[in-house]
Structure formats: C-alpha cells, structure tokens
Amino acid sequence: MDFQLTEEQQLIRNLTREIARKYIAPRAAEIDVEEQYPEDVFQVYREAGLLGLTIPKAYGGSNEGGGFLSLALAVEEVAKYCCASGLMLLLTALPTQPIVLGGTEEQKETYLPPIAKGEMKAAYGLTEPNAGSDAAAIQARAVKKNGSYVINGEKAFISGGSVADYVTIFAKTNPAARSRGISGFIVPKTSPGFSVARLDEKMGVRGVPTALLAFQDCTVPEENLLGGRENEGFKTVLGTLNSVRPIVAARGLGLAQGAMSYALSFAEKREAFGGPIANLQAIQFMFADMVIQIEAARLLTYQAAWLVDQGCFQKQHSHMLSVAKAFATETAVKVSSDALQVLGAQGYMRDHPLERHYRDARQLMIVEGTSQIHRVIISRALLDRDLVYP
C-alpha cells in the first residue's frame, strides 16, 4: 500500500500552499464581508494553471489519471484560509465532469478548454426549489422543437450561477419516466430565455454567489443536448456527484486544519490560571480529538479522490465516497466549533476567523448530498452486500 504522492501532486500541493498563504489568507475576511466573487483570486489560479486539474489533457487540462487527488490537495490548502476560494476550484470540476463523462466529442472540444484556460467560468444546475435530495423529482422541462430544445423551470442554490458563462443543467425530457427521463444540457448565459432571477443571502461561503436561475422558454440548439441522447442524464448526474464528493471532503479537511492551527496558536499565547491555556489538560484533550478527526478525514478524503481517479465512482464504490464526504464535512463542523470554544468569547468575534470558519463549515454538510443522504447510501450498500465485512 503506497501512500506517496506523485512528484506532480507534491508540486501542486506546494504551489497551492504558497498561493493560499500569500494571496488568499490576507483576503479571506474581506472576501467574506464583501460578498463578491474575488476575480483577483481567480486570476491567480489561472496564472498558476490550477483551473484544469480534472479536465483531461486532450481537452486543455492537466489530468492524466490523478486529477481528482490533485484537485483535492489544492482545495485542502486553500480551504485552510478561505472555504469560498476552495469552492472556486471545485467549480472547475463540478460543471465540467458531466461533459467529461457524457458529452460528445464536439461538446468536450468546445466547452472544456475554455474552463482549463480560465477563459470561461461554469456552473452546475441540478437542484430546484422543490427538488434537492430527491434529484429525480426535478420539474424543469425540456421539449424538442424545430431543431432546438426549449427549457422551462428554475434551478436553485446554484453556486457561481451569476458569474458563469455556461451552466450544465438537467431537465426532464420524459417526465413520466422519472429518473429515466432526465437529460443534460449545456446552456450558455447568452441563451434566449435564460436569466439570473435572484442572488441569495447566505450564512457563509459568501465569496461565491449563489443564485436562482430561471429558464423561461430558454432555447438552446440541439447540439447542446449532453451526449446527443435524450433520457440518459441521470447516470451522468450520479457519476458527477460521486466524482466531486472527495473535493467537498477536501474543503472540510482544509477548513478543519485551518481552524485547529489558529486555535492552537492562540492557546499557546493566551494566559490563564498561571500559564498558557495550552498547558491545561482539558484544552490539550480538545486538540488531541481534533487531530484524531483530521487525520482520519485526511485518509478517507485521499482514498476517495484516488478511487475517483481509478474510475471507481459508480454504485459499487459510492459508499466509500459518501463515507469520506460525510466524515470530513462533519469533522469541519466539529473542529471549527471546538476551535472557536478554545478562544471563548474572542472566538465569537469577527476579529478572529473562527466564526467565519464555523459559518462556512455548516454549508459542507448540505451540498453534494446531505449527511443524511450519505447515511442512506452507506446503509443501502451494507444491506445490498456491496459493503461486506468478514
């Protein structure tokens, strides 16, 4: 069992660590307060070549087989300081993976290189106002008409939806067939009938806008049907969500490390009861528990990303991706809460980053499958004997 990173992965981690410390850490609080997409951070990513880590090399990216672990490493480093900046990197994979998995050759050649080069941004549209965890219940409708598809419906809570040049969405082409009647579409922002209906006000992760997208007789050409085939989108939905779950886990892993490191530095300096509070066993045990959770989350996250890189992201391996996502994101919430507790009243104040880490962490247990949905996936794998213990 080899736990060594490749030379390229080590370079990516070191590069991203330097970028995070130099550019992102000083901007993190400001990004949260301004609630504006940090274009300067995006340009830093672009210049560093970090926008195509999961996009195959044949389409302008740098992925030759280890891209998801590379992206997880990069996101982990960034999320130590700013979870929103980590989400920006995730959004190079989430909207493009459906095209990688199910797109035509023409779609791959058209829509993947601009993301890898930083010439475009993209978003992913699955969730609707009345369809979240039950993805098969989406109500957006696409009807073929005169060589085009006319789309009607809404997509809710879409990360980066207001800054995206195109959105990869899913809609019903055969409503009676439920999940077997779902198709994917690539919708450029210039499409007639497409609009950003609302920007949401959020508790955390404020640097990446979240939008309600409206499709009112939105017309896209027939060649924008993902894969050129109707009613085959749901398999792509599942493959995409499974693929990016280790990246969400990496956001949690990085956030937890950042929160713990800040609290530890504080505890070593804060004097109480005759010395630094880091000398108190009660505080030491809190940090020991943080380390246990973080190191377990690290192994699960890296393993999950490695599985995706091996092509193991379909049903028989989905439970391991769910284990990683659920554990790492819940670790982020627990560790950020305990780190805030170490600071006491100071941790509750905006003078310190821990209140932001805590707000940001809470998002992670919801996106790309709630913690409860992941427990459903894991328990089903156990009952179906996909997950077998001797």
Range-by-range predicted roles:
Residues Q216-K235:
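Long, acidic (Asp/Glu-rich), low-complexity accessory segments flanking structured domains
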Residues G147-S148, N152-V196:
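A short core secondary-structure module
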Residues M1-S85, G102-Q107, P114-G118, D134, ...:
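Alpha-helical interface subdomain recognition
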Residues A93-G102:
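Helix-loop "lid/cap" segments that line or gate small-molecule binding pockets
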Residues L90, I115, N130-S133, F157-G160, ...:
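Short Gly/Pro-enriched turn/cap motifs at secondary-structure boundaries
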Residues A137, T190-P221:
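Flexible, small-/acidic-enriched active-site or ligand-binding loops
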Residues G118-L126:
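A short, Trp-centered hydrophobic/proline-enriched beta-strand micro-motif
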Residues G49, V75-A79, A171, V187-P192, ...:
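Short Ser/Thr-interspersed hydrophobic loop/turn segments at strand-loop and sheet-helix junctions
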